[in-house]
Amino acid sequence: MMVINSVVVGTVVASKNVNEFEFVIENQVIDKIKKGEFVITKNTHGDYLLSKITKIVSVNALIGDKSEDASELAKIRGVIYSEEMLNNSSKFLASAKILGVINNESGSIESNVYPINVPQNVYLTKDDLLAKIFSNGSIEVGYLKVRSSTKVKLNAKELCSRHFAVLAMTGAGKSNTIAVLVQELFEKDKGKMNIVIVDPHGEYVKMRNTHILPAKLNPILVPEEHLAKLLGIGENSSVQKSFLVYAALTVKYECKENKKQISGLEYLKKIEEKLVECADKIANSEDKKRIYIEYYDGTRCRXKTVKKDDEMSINRVIEKLRWFINKNKNILGENEGMFDIKSDKINVLPLQKIEDEEAITIVGEFLKRVLKERIKSVHDEIVEIKALEKPTLVIIEEAHLFAAKNLKDRSGYWINRIAKEGRKFGVGLGLVSQRPKELNPTVLSQMNTKIILRIVEPTDQKYILESSENVGEDLLQDLPQLSTGEAIVVGSSLPLPALVKIKKYDGVLGGEDGLKNLKI
């Protein structure tokens, strides 16, 4: 493969180190050169170097350091030099970052350790070389912004197995990006891998080839401490929490002893019955100082002394339990339908009608089951969910809600587990967020490919930089200037970071701007 293009675009005039250089752009090709363009030079070892233009400035030797003095400039332009002389003395100086040595056979890029000679020619990179670098994957997401003829294709295995994140401010195009990724993955690997989208706002339910998974909350699978949180029992309400735990453990123990299986609404109703029994016993007790109740702790029966004042606390728990049941009656029940995953469909788990805490619990239980089933599959154990014999990619929208910084919630715990262990068991993660700084930094750092669309908030930019090894300051500087649908793609699924124009998804999404037709 020939590396050198016949088009000379400039001459090297300075080389600061082995990582960067400056060159003067030839006037006749200035219209072909722009920031982000790729160019070729040689190092002193004779290797071809691929570099990217990071800055272009205009300089004029006749003006020199007088460019900030308005009166001096006026004299220069009107008296000392003619406009023609000034124009002829104007040059464009480009700064370039050396990306590495080009392997002439494979097109791969290796680190450079040699300086470059001054002066020497700078060449425009050929399309076929850029295609060898950026079009070698199977997942086409768009094209290079600086070279629309070069398609950008990601490595599907690296993208899914090593996890990815799509980060953007609202309206920058993240939903379209996910739709493009999912459709490409579905069409290229149909039936080989499960794809599930956790969809808090119903943005993806209208996509082609979707299969809707009904979101269900089975409270018997929820730890008692977390059930208290769902009911709105605060951390400081220790008495209320203790009575809820006593009642829940007792119900579970009695069902086990009677070999009776219950779940969903029936489980909560049984807890309510136990709490009512306890409150009635306190209310009807003649001995106001020594009142005993019995409960099971999961292994045996225990007795507990309660006070008359505890009746009020128990009644408060009953009120909260009834409120919770009434609010969530449509989602309480067996959750087996939530795992009716179809390998030949794009599976969507819509959560738009569910409150945050309940959604967090549902997602936590879903991720837990997916990971545990995949672990069984890898260890050749019997898998209860047939589809989970295959590798599975779970894409989570509004990921900052489910993987917040403290990881206290159940969803955060399982997202962290999958981020660290999922690759071994064939579970991939895709996290999508418009609030990067609210994501757990450990989880974000495990996302080995990042697709970053427009972000203007400095704290978000800094947070991305701190949690990503392969995102540099030079890339972050471009984020505020990106247009809708433009993204910086960096990580293991692409050989080099690239500024990409994401292609348009050719179907229907449900998350369009609700105010777009408003006339003001």
UniProtKB/Swiss-Prot annotation:
InterPro entries: HerA-like (IPR008571), HerA_barrel_dom (IPR018538), HerA_C (IPR033186), HerA_central (IPR002789), P-loop_NTPase (IPR027417). One of its GO terms (molecular function) is ATP hydrolysis activity. This is Probable helicase MJECL08. Pfam families: DUF87 (PF01935), HAS-barrel (PF09378), HerA_C (PF05872). Keywords: ATP-binding, DNA-binding, Helicase, Hydrolase, Isomerase, Nucleotide-binding, Plasmid. It catalyses: Couples ATP hydrolysis with the unwinding of duplex DNA at the replication fork by translocating in the 5'-3' direction. This creates two antiparallel DNA single strands (ssDNA). The leading ssDNA polymer is the template for DNA polymerase III holoenzyme which synthesizes a continuous strand; ATP + H2O = ADP + phosphate + H(+); Couples ATP hydrolysis with the unwinding of duplex DNA by translocating in the 3'-5' direction. ATP binds at residues 162, 171-176, 501-502. It is an enzyme of class 5 (isomerase). The keyword Cell cycle does not apply. A probably bidirectional DNA helicase. Its EC number is 5.6.2.3, 5.6.2.4. Belongs to the HerA family.
